[in-house]
Structure formats: structure tokens, C-alpha cells
Amino acid sequence: METRGISALGCFAASARQGRFVSRPGAQRPHCGLLCAPMDLPKGVLNNFMDLSFTSFWGQLVGNPILIITVAFTLGVIFVNGWTDAPNAIATCVTTRCLGVRQAIWMSALFNFLGVFVMTQINSSVASTISNMVDFGADTSSALIALCAALLSIVVYSVGASIFGIPTSESHSLIAGLSGAAIAIQGGVGGINFNEWVKVLYGLALSLLLGFASGWLICKLVTILCRNIELRAANRFFRVAQIAGAAGMSFMHGAQDGQKFIGVLFLGLAFSHGQNSVAGMEIPVWLMLLCSVVMALGTSVGGEKIIKSVGMDMVKLERYQGFCADLAGAACLLFSSLFGIPVSTTHTKTSAIMGVGAVKRLSAINYGVVKDMMLTWIFTFPGCGLISFVMAKIFMQIW
């Protein structure tokens, strides 16, 4: 099956329902500045085309207070994601003393920016899956209000967990928040697209298995290949290698989590134009840049408590082990992103660290920290989902 490198968000969403991609290699598409409307779309899709240039967006923003709130909440969630989730990418690099905390945070900010911007242009199918996961109904005004509630619930839950230094899964929070709001506005589970919802859960579970297995396998291979290398020379090499691995992990964090929230913001823009679907439209460049910058700013704030929890408390790592964990995590995220599977970057990285620790001995893993993290992830679905449900009901009564 051949597919274009840059796929339209709507093309994927429309064709995913039929279990296939819509693709015509070599097809020409007219260029219109920051937004391109693909011509090879299913019949009737172009009727939903809307102007998503920055000028049009600014005009909509000025006259629509609900859109202002939606955009503010979305950017707030992206910022919090950079603050709370991105430190996972550099935790091992800091705890093995390859880089100082602030150096690592600034490096992560740069590569998170590049990950969001570059990967969304290459393959935006992760954003598609997220935007297609729930149905807020035909009333786009109410849908926009419910989306506001979902986003606020994610911020509240994530900030609360971060204050106590508990690693959070923004992917879990996003799914729970959107689902709670959709159930509230539809009055039941009819607002949930279970085909997409279950696919996302499969991806989250897969991240655990792939992360652990790849971490264990890569570390085992490195241990065998480097067993005759002098320790000082190995440490010099793995210091550089781990910095590169942390940069790659940061890039893939931006690619995965950035796309998820771009998909949500894109859906909010569609609601503000009276459309309940984003089928047939590509993500504009200005939107990619905006989300990239905000995630980079959130990352620059840093989350030193989370770095300590993930990198120091879970497993005591040496430099080669930190490199193996970063390489395994980045590889799993790349695989998932290329196939459009939204996964938890937190799950992937922490399970890779556990896999690396298991090579030496199972007792090297601090199971108390692992247990706390698993309980946090388990509570995210009902906790964040309930907050979103209640907020959606309140918001719809107010507006």
C-alpha cells in the first residue's frame, strides 16, 4: 500500500472508518499559502472546506469568546504537557550526569519544538486518531463548550499530580477528558467512537510491552558487544551517545504528544466554524508552529521532581543503561507514530527503564515507585473523566 508522506488529517479520519487510507500517488493539489485543500477526497468532503488561514483564525478569535477560552485551555494543556511529561525524555540523561538539569531541559525544549513541527508535516495520523475518537454531536456551539471543559479537566488533573511529583500520562488524561465531556454532552456512551477508543487503549498497552522488551533487548546486546571495552573509553562514548538518545527521545515526545493536542485544537477550530468534522482539511503551518512553541516553553520550565522520580528512584542507572533506555523509548515512539498509534510517552520511557534494569537483576527495580505510577495511571481514567464530565455539565448550564 502506497501512501503520501504528508497526509491530510481529514483524509485519514474519513478513510479510517472504511479501514483504509485514501491515496493517489502523484495526484496534484493546489497550493494556497498556509493551507492546502487536497483534491483527491471522497465525494462531498470539499463541501466542508473552511478557511483556516491565520487571518481568518484571528478574526474568529476576536468575535468568539468561547473560542478564546478553547484556544487558551488547549495551549495551557500543551504547556502543562511540556512541563510535566517532557522531563521523562531527559530523566536518564540527567541522573547519569551526562548533562546538567538546565542544559538538558533547554535541549529537550528545542527538540520537542522540532518534533511537533517536523513530524506533523510528515505524518499527522496520530492527530487524526485523537480528533476522531469522540463525537460531540451536531450542535457545534455545545460541542465547543464541552471541549473547553475537557481541556480544563486535563490541566487541573495534571497540575495536581505534578505538584506531588507524580509522573502523569497526558495520553490517559486526554482520552479521559474527551470521553467524559462527550458522555456529558450526548447523555451516554453514544458520544464515544469505540473503534478508535479501543485502538488507543491497545496502543497504550503496547507501549508497555514494547518499551520493556526493547529496553531489555537493547541493553542485553550492548552489554555483550561492549564487554571487552575499557570502562573509561566506554563512559566517554556513552556520554555522547546518551545525549543524542535524550535528544531523540525529546523529538519523539513532541511528535507524539504534540500531535495529540494539535488534533484537539484543530477540532475546536472546526467547531468555531460550525463544522463538526475536520474531514478534508490539512493542519495549517501556523497551527503547527504555535503548538511547537508552546510545548517548548512548557518544557523549558522543567519538572525536576519528575526527573528524580523517573530517573533516580525507579532504577539506579549507569550511562550505557541510560542510553539503552533512551534508544528503546525513542524507537517505540517512532514506530507508533509512523503507524498513527497514539501511545503514552510516559509509559514507553518508564517501561524501557524497567526493561534495562531487569537485565542486571530484577531487584534493581524500585517496585514501590512502579506501583505508585501504575496506580496513578489507573486512577487517571475515572478521575480525569469524572472531572471532565462534571465540568462539561456545569459549563453547558452557564453558557
Task: Please state what every model-predicted region is.
Residues 2, 28, 40-43, 47-48:
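Intrinsically disordered, low-complexity polyampholyte segments enriched for Lys and acidic residues
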Residues 2-7, 11:
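Extreme N-terminal basic, low-complexity initiation segments
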Residues 48-399:
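Multi-pass alpha-helical transmembrane bundle typical of ion/small-solute transporters
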